[in-house]
């Protein structure tokens, strides 16, 4: 199904539409959060997450949602799930009964679950959201990739060794800096003490001995 199918047919004249928008305060753009790419193991269940932020609470009588599938960027979109006051699963032949709604519109979550993922499920999944009085349609786009085998686990030994080495090096540097700072502080204190002693000795020599003057 093409995106044009999303747009509602006008139910009143352009004059009435203009008057309606003039009375409604301008809404802020809706933000939709989805993963750009989702890697899923063949035969497993995949949750296609889609959440949104809106300035307005969700009114189920006005809220609307469309989930569509595309085989490629330039391919036509097929709608497989929508929300019109309730969830409507269109049960495309491609998915049959493998699609379930797992979100909660009242909590700004419209995610879906795809059971038993197959290689032919690979493609683009679009999440379209309208939450009046927001005038902007939210759109999230997920590229689903199906893996035929689990990716090899990354060896974390090297990372641990590098991290430990860096941490040890930083600890040594900090220790050296502290030692240098302590040595400098002790030297400064010693110089200050020596200067004070010299100053006191000079004062004593300047005053002289009173008995020497009497002679």
From Swiss-Prot:
Q: Which UniProt keywords apply?
A: Atrial fibrillation, Brugada syndrome, Cell membrane, Cell projection, Disease variant, Disulfide bond, Glycoprotein, Immunoglobulin domain, Ion transport, Membrane, Phosphoprotein, Signal, Sodium, Sodium transport, Transmembrane, Transmembrane helix, Transport
User: What Pfam families has UniProt attached to this entry?
Assistant: V-set
Give residue ranges on the Extracellular side: 30-157
UniProt-annotated glycosylation sites, renumbered to this chain: 42, 66, 74
Provide the Ig-like C2-type domain boundaries. Answer: 32-154
Q: Name the residue ranges with Basic and acidic residues bias.
A: 189-215
Which GO molecular-function terms appear in the entry? sodium channel regulator activity; voltage-gated potassium channel activity involved in ventricular cardiac muscle cell action potential repolarization; voltage-gated sodium channel activity involved in cardiac muscle cell action potential
* Signal peptide span: 1-29
**One biological process term in Gene Ontology:** membrane depolarization during action potential
Membrane side Cytoplasmic: residue ranges? 180-215
Q: Which family does it belong to?
A: Belongs to the sodium channel auxiliary subunit SCN2B (TC 8.A.17) family.
What protein name is recorded for this chain? Answer: Sodium channel regulatory subunit beta-2
The species this protein was found in: Homo sapiens (Human)
């Amino acid at each position: 199904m093409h995106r044009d199918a999303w747009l509602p047919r006008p139910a009143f004249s352009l004059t009435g539409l203009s008057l309606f928008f003039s009375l409604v305060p301008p809404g802020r753009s809706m933000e939709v959060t989805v993963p750009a790419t989702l890697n899923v193991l063949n035969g497993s269940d995949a949750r296609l997450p889609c959440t949104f932020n809106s300035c307005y609470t969700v009114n189920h009588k006005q809220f609307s949602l469309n989930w569509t599938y595309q085989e490629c960027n330039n391919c036509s979109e097929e709608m497989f799930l929508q929300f019109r006051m309730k969830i409507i699963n269109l049960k495309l032949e491609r998915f049959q009964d493998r699609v379930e709604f797992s979100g909660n519109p009242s909590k700004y979550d419209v995610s879906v679950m795809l059971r038993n993922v197959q290689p032919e499920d690979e493609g683009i999944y679009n999440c379209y959201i309208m939450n009046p009085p927001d005038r902007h349609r939210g759109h999230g786009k997920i590229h689903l990739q199906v893996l035929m085998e689990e990716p090899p686990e990354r060896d974390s030994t090297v990372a641990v060794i590098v991290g430990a080495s860096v941490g040890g090096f930083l600890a040594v540097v900090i220790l050296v800096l502290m030692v240098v700072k302590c040595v400098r502080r002790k030297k400064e204190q010693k110089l200050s003490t020596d200067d004070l002693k010299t100053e006191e000795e000079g004062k004593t020599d300047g005053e002289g001995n009173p008995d020497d003057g009497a002679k």
